């Protein structure tokens, strides 16, 4: 309980920084779990610290800000004007918009960001999206709608990203696994930009 009070106090003082730290940490935990539970290579058995760092960077510097903004938009802009804002029909609307707009676009964005941070080409990002987008989206739809219905109904706005991030430890484990799965399967070479002297 004390930890929650510290989190709330920090969220009031520095909301963006707090969300960035929390989201990055939980993305990192997801990647650590993925590497320990689902090692992707029988040849390279070492732990990939850079991969975890990429997950933390994505969570902290990219997703935390997008997620925070997205939940504010869902809360403040997405509702039927003729119903009370917290009516069950508005919760259904928010879940539908979240799952039919944000999720289908967020997954390719994730795979693209990770490819770029891995130093790989856009062709690799396209390959990841081609092979992983639909199965990952189907899994997303099996996991997130029920949770988001609860999240939008019960959890206060300022804690929604935290609630998502806690549940997302498992989701991030899965995403990290899916992201690395394409790379192992295809052994796509890393393309670094040419050095200009």
UniProtKB/Swiss-Prot annotation:
Changing residue 54 to Q: Almost abolishes function. InterPro entries: Mpv17_PMP22. The chain crosses the membrane at residues 20-40, 55-75, 97-117, 137-157. Keywords: Membrane, Mitochondrion, Mitochondrion inner membrane, Transmembrane, Transmembrane helix. It is found in: Mitochondrion inner membrane. GO terms for biological process: ethanol metabolic process. It is a multi-pass membrane protein. It holds the Pfam family Mpv17_PMP22. GO terms for cellular component: cytoplasm; mitochondrial inner membrane; mitochondrion. It comes from the Eukaryota. Changing residue 54 to W: Loss of function. Present with 1870 molecules/cell in log phase SD medium. Belongs to the peroxisomal membrane protein PXMP2/4 family. May be involved in cellular response to stress. Required to maintain mitochondrial DNA (mtDNA) integrity and stability. Required for ethanol metabolism and tolerance during heat shock. This is Protein SYM1. The gene is SYM1.
């Amino acid at each position: 309980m004390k930890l929650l009070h510290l989190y709330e106090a920090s969220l009031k003082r520095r909301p963006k920084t707090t969300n960035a730290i929390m989201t990055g940490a939980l993305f990192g935990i997801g990647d650590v779990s993925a590497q320990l539970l689902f090692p992707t290579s029988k040849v390279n058995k070492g732990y990939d610290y850079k991969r975890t760092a990429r997950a933390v960077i994505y969570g902290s510097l990219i997703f935390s800000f997008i997620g925070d903004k997205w939940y504010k938009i869902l809360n403040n802009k997405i509702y039927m004007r003729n119903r009370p804002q917290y009516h069950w029909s508005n919760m259904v609307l928010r879940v539908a918009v979240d799952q039919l707009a944000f999720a289908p676009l967020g997954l390719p964005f994730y795979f693209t960001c990770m490819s770029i941070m891995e130093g790989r080409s856009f062709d690799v990002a396209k390959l990841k999206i081609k092979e992983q987008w639909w199965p990952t989206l189907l899994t997303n739809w099996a996991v997130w709608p029920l949770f988001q219905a609860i999240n939008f109904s019960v959890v206060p706005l300022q804690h929604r990203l935290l609630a998502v991030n806690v549940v997302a430890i498992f989701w991030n484990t899965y995403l990290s696994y899916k992201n690395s799965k394409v790379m192992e399967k295809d052994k796509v070479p890393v393309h670094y930009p040419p050095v200009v002297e």
